[in-house]
Amino acid sequence: MSEDAAVEETPVWLEVNGAPLVTWMCTPDLLEELALGWLHGEGYIDSVDDVRLRPCSTDLGFWATIPEAKLEAIRAENRRPVLASGCGAVATYLADPAGAPITRRPPVVLPPVEQLRQLFKTLFQLGTRYRDTGGIHAAALTDGATLLAHAEDIGRHNAVDKVIGSLVLNRRTIAGLGLLVTGRISAELAFKAARAGITWVATPSVPSTLAVEIARRNGMVLIGRAVSGTPALHGAAPAGAG
């Protein structure tokens, strides 16, 4: 029996303003992107200019310094620690979606079904770790025509943080883009996408009911069974619906 097919997993920690905040169990690549994407998706930063990120030279981890006002605003949300359904971060904090304000956005324009399938085909072709081992998740940000960033990780939320962080690092606009994921769309993933201004999220799998509620309240469309002939739309109504 060979060990070649084992998926690499390692802990990576993050401290913010001197306090331990999160530890990821993750695939150890694109770690700066992972940290930036997580901070952006959780509302700690709006851009790379909001943070000073220093890697530890003796361990896999980062020290981040952000404006204290940002940290106080997060604390004021009274987020509760939650054991999330996804793999990746050891701890996560979610606000109550039922209490979140409804975000009014223009109707979302979705790519045609065949174009969506082609985008996923490209993502799967880029999945070298998946081909080598299986048991890995992938994510990509797209403008509907091409993939702008992609990543693989043992945790699907980590893969999303990595692609968001890639655009944050390169000072590229995330709002208005679409997100491809290979696993189910959980509440945590929907929160991350909504905070980033992503307008639609697609998966070959399905979204959770709480993810659908988050999408509905934030004007976001979730696309389940995206590589099938008849994708299922959830959340906000896309342009041309009705």
Predicted regions and their residues:
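Histidine/lysine/aspartate-rich catalytic loop segments that bind and position anionic ligands
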Residues: 126-172, 178-179
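Generic structural hydrophobic/aromatic packing signal, biased to beta-strands
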Residues: 14, 64, 87, 139, ...
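Intrinsically disordered, low-complexity regions enriched in acidic/Ser/Thr/Pro/Gln residues
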Residues: 1-143, 149-150
